[in-house]
Amino acid sequence: VILVVEGSPSYAMRALESIQNQDLYDLQIVVVCRDAAPGVRHSLQVAADRDIHIDLIDVEDAKRGACLRAGFAASRGSQIIAMNADEWLAPQSLSKMVDIACDTAADIVFPTVSLDRYDAHRERHSRVLNVAPIVIEDKSSMVSGLSQLILGGLVAQTSGVMYSRSLFEACLLCDKVFRTVGFMACALSRAQCVSGCGDACFHAAAPKLTDAFDPTMYAKVSDDIRALDELADSLSEADSGGRLKLASQKFYFAGLVACIENLCLSPHGVSSIERSARMRDMLEAPRTRQMVAALKDNHRGLGLLFGPIASAKPTRCVMCTHLAAFLNRTGAKTA
C-alpha cells in the first residue's frame, strides 16, 4: 500500500492505522512524505520505528506524480493500492480484495467506495458507490461491466483500487495522471481480468464543488470524457446495443452539471459577465451538443438542468442551478 502524505493532513494517522489494522501479515506500507508538517512527519516516523512493515521515504520533487512514482519504486508487492492521507480502509477490506485477486487472477479489484464529507459538527455524511459483483474477462463482459462502473461513478475512482504490479507500472510508464479517468481507462484497456469486491470498503473524501471556483474544472471533465470515449470506441464492436456509449453520455452530463454548480454556487466565484461567457462556452461545446442529441429521448431522472442545457440558455441554467440547490437543501424531490 502506497500512502501519500502532503502538507499537514489532520487524518494522516487514521489512514496509516487503518492499513496497519488490516488482517494481512504479508503487507508492505510505503509512506511517502512531501512537504509534511513537522508534527505529522514526527508521528509517522514514530510509527515507522515501531512497525517493520512501514517504509518511510521523503520526496522533494515537486512534479505531479513524483510521490506515486517514488512510492512504487520502493514497493515490492505483487498487488498495489495507492491512497492519500484523508482516505482510509475499512477493517478486513484488504484481505478480502487480495482473496478476490488470487481467486480470479484479476488485474484490477474494485472495492465499494464511501465518499465522506464532514459537517460543522464533525458528523460524517456518506454517499456509497456500490461495486457490483462484476467479473470482466473479455470484450463482451467489458461492455456490461464498464457500463456499470461508469454509471456507478467508480470509473473515476483510482485510489483504493487494487492493481497488479505490472498493470500499475504500465499506467505509470504511459505517463497517465493518477486520480483521473485517463489513468483508469489506461488500466482497463490493458487488464485481462477485472473483479469487484463488494464486501471491501474504501473511504474517500467527497469532492467539494462549491468551496471555490475552479477555472480548470471543465477542462478536466473534457479530458476525462475524451479518455472514456477512446475506451468506448475500442469496444464499439462488442457494444452492439450502445449501452457503453449511453453510459458515457450520462457520465459527461454529470460532469457538466458539476461544472455548472461550481460556476454558479461558489461563494468566491466570478463576475456575471465572465460567468455568462463560461456558461455559454460549456453549453455550446460540440461534446455538449452531442450529449444532448444522444440523451434527448432518454433523459428521465437527469434532473432540472437537462432542459436548460439542451436549449443552451445560460440564464436558465443559472436559475435552475440555484433552484436545484434550494430543493436539495429542503429535501424536496425533483423528477
Language model regions located:
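Short, well-formed alpha-helical segments that are part of the catalytic scaffolds
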Residues: 7-21, 39
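Active-site acidic Asp-centered loop
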Residues: 34, 83-85
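Glycine-rich, basic loop-to-helix element that forms the pyrophosphate-binding segment
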Residues: 59-75
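Acidic donor-binding segment of Leloir-type glycosyltransferases
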Residues: 20-58
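Membrane-interface aromatic/basic loop that binds lipid-linked glycans or pyrophosphate carriers
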Residues: 87, 105-106, 265-335
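Catalytic core of nucleotide-sugar-dependent glycosyltransferases
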Residues: 199-207, 212-240, 258, 266-288
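Donor-binding/catalytic cores of nucleotide-activated saccharide
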Residues: 88-197, 204-217
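Short aromatic/hydrophobic "clamp" motif used to bind/position activated sugar donors
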Residues: 80
